Regions:
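Cytosolic, long alpha-helical scaffolding segments
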Residues: 1-233
């Protein structure tokens, strides 16, 4: 009976910390969406809201890490439970930087607005990459909540699209700067925005790899897609 009671407590603690991670995920997802809106509308007000949220993201990361450390020290989990806790830790470590990237986008948007060249920049060219990255993050969070390896594999495949969009945008931006050197400073800010968007996709990919690790016990980092698909079955 005592063992069953301890098991129930442990399950409750696992569910609690998992819920906290999903709460953090929801917060950074809203941050990145607001940052993308700030970019599309060149809205300083929206950018300020993104920046103001960053402190909450950082505080939640610290709370989750503290809770994880406590659970591991007290429960000494094994096998899949331990893998889940490790994955939660790594997922948290990938969500917090998404908040950082959102803040970076917001600050770059404000710099572009202050430069007075917002409307002349090809910011709309980033729309596809931004929506892809935001969508991948949403899929990664949903897949993590359900521990769905098939969705995790699809995320790893789709991340390549964001990389392609980024490369294409860089080529266009270089051409734009060559045609009008006066826009170089503001264009570089837009380049930093593009890189931040690409990194959001990278963090979604990392979360997808964590899902496969929890469910299958396979570390698929830096692995070819054929191996990933086989490991996730």
């Amino acid at each position: 009976m005592a063992d069953k009671h301890l098991s129930t407590q442990f399950d409750s603690e696992l569910n609690g910390v998992s819920s906290r991670v999903m709460e953090l995920g929801g917060l950074v997802e809203s941050q990145i969406r607001l940052a993308i809106f700030a970019l599309s509308q060149f809205s300083a007000e929206s950018a300020d809201q993104v920046i103001a949220t960053e402190a909450s993201v950082n505080a939640m990361e610290i709370d989750i890490d503290r809770e994880l450390s406590s659970i591991i020290a007290r429960r000494q989990p094994t096998a899949r439970d331990l893998r889940l806790l490790i994955a939660i830790s790594k997922t948290t470590a990938n969500l917090e930087p998404v908040g950082d990237e959102a803040e970076k986008i917001a600050r770059m948007v404000k710099s572009i607005i202050e430069s007075g060249s917002a409307r002349s920049l090809p910011a709309s060219e980033l729309n596809v990459a931004a929506e892809l990255a935001s969508g991948l993050l949403r899929k990664a969070l949903d897949a993590f909540a359900r521990l769905d390896t098939s969705v995790a594999v699809s995320i790893l495949k789709e991340d390549d699209q964001i990389d392609e969009e980024f490369d294409g945008f860089v080529r266009k931006l270089i051409t734009y700067m060559m045609e009008d050197p006066r826009t170089i400073s503001a264009s570089l800010n837009l380049l930093f925005v593009a890189k931040a968007i690409e990194r959001v996709g990278d963090h979604a990919k990392n979360i997808a790899e964590c899902i496969i690790y929890v469910v299958k016990g396979a570390d698929v980092r830096h692995s070819p897609m054929a191996h990933i698909e086989s490991a996730a079955k």
